[in-house]
């Protein structure tokens, strides 16, 4: 190890930055975040630095560097484009035993400014010791995706209860075990999901001996339309820490592959006229599993609150006092239309968008047809594959032109995506010949014409033909 990672407390302490350009402005910004009292030495200032000066956040010495300017400084950064000046700053700072960093010159530095993942008060620093800063930044980017932005709130929450926990537990080992349980349990998740008041109440109950630290919870997570890259960071984190996963038919196999490997998997998918479990039984299953103390992932395709019956499920959870959180997902209308190259709104074609379902019941589809055939809008129909012929007939019967563009997308956003385009008059026959299978999404409106120009996603031909 060539360098020792340390964190310096700089609040209200004098720091000197030599240089007034863009790079210097970035270094000044870092020092400002740490609360330092910053003086910039430069004949001229970058607009960002000039703004900071006008707002009274920094001091400015409008001159070239002089050694006397180092007097009193506890840290120095040289960020000029003059190599000789940078060497002089390094030499004079080291003669005074002042830590010095020279940008892009590790041989002149006594400290390195790392790449930083800021989740204040939690900080992660990544450094290559000046040998490969680009690699360090790439690694920092990967770490950024692994640490939720709300981890800073979790660290601040822990600080709030630190003394109370010290009073409650006498040994370091007891405190460590307690905090691990807090961070990995319901209280930690409440903080991360923004339910801090509930977390404080639960923490106070536990510390007073009136509450339990270990109890179950439910994560109602939207798995998106199929492509796992469209998952949110929070969805992925909860998927990888659940004890049991209750999942639907519409969750793609690629998304399911990201669920914690040793989690129990319970399939409750529904298809037309065939339900593995009635909805009320699913609701009660979630309650039972949570009461067993398990972290339950309720994973749904798309978004749980858009035709996903998520509202019914959390009603039951609330009635039974089960902690839960809801993680939105990209609904099929958004994700699938984007991957199909069909914008849902467009200045020239559609100023509004309507979502509905196309369930076929007793040979008919019961929809507000007058609303569906209004001009200058896009209609998106979920679960309408079987009812497609009836949908097209009814739209024409209620005034829509037979040549109105319409498209249907099978397994959108995945490598098995297939798109069939036509009109209200022609699409049912085209779909029958194509042999499409659910899940499918129907898009009706003039925006479908744009697909010819805007289609960008090209699944593997081998996969599509095999599907």
Swiss-Prot record:
Top-level taxonomic group: Bacteria
GO BP, sorted A to Z: cobalamin biosynthetic process; methylation; siroheme biosynthetic process
Annotated region described as Precorrin-2 dehydrogenase /sirohydrochlorin ferrochelatase, given as residue ranges: 1-203
Entry's EC annotation: 2.1.1.107, 1.3.1.76, 4.99.1.4
Phosphoserine: residues carrying this PTM: 128
Metabolic or biological pathway, per its Swiss-Prot or TrEMBL entry: Cofactor biosynthesis; adenosylcobalamin biosynthesis; precorrin-2 from uroporphyrinogen III: step 1/1; Cofactor biosynthesis; adenosylcobalamin biosynthesis; sirohydrochlorin from precorrin-2: step 1/1; Porphyrin-containing compound metabolism; siroheme biosynthesis; precorrin-2 from uroporphyrinogen III: step 1/1; Porphyrin-containing compound metabolism; siroheme biosynthesis; siroheme from sirohydrochlorin: step 1/1
SUPFAM superfamilies (alphabetical): NAD(P)-binding Rossmann-fold domains, Siroheme synthase middle domains-like, Tetrapyrrole methylase
Entry keyword set: Cobalamin biosynthesis, Lyase, Methyltransferase, Multifunctional enzyme, NAD, Oxidoreductase, Phosphoprotein, Porphyrin biosynthesis, S-adenosyl-L-methionine, Transferase
Record: residues binding S-adenosyl-L-methionine: 225, 301-303, 306, 331-332, 383, 412
UniProt-annotated catalytic positions: 248, 270
Keyword Membrane: no
Segments for region (Uroporphyrinogen-III C-methyltransferase): 216-467
Binding site for NAD(+): 22-23, 43-44
GO molecular function, one term: NAD binding
Family affiliation: In the N-terminal section; belongs to the precorrin-2 dehydrogenase / sirohydrochlorin ferrochelatase family.
Functional description taken from the UniProt entry: Then it catalyzes the NAD-dependent ring dehydrogenation of precorrin-2 to yield sirohydrochlorin. Finally, it catalyzes the ferrochelation of sirohydrochlorin to yield siroheme.
Record protein name field: Siroheme synthase
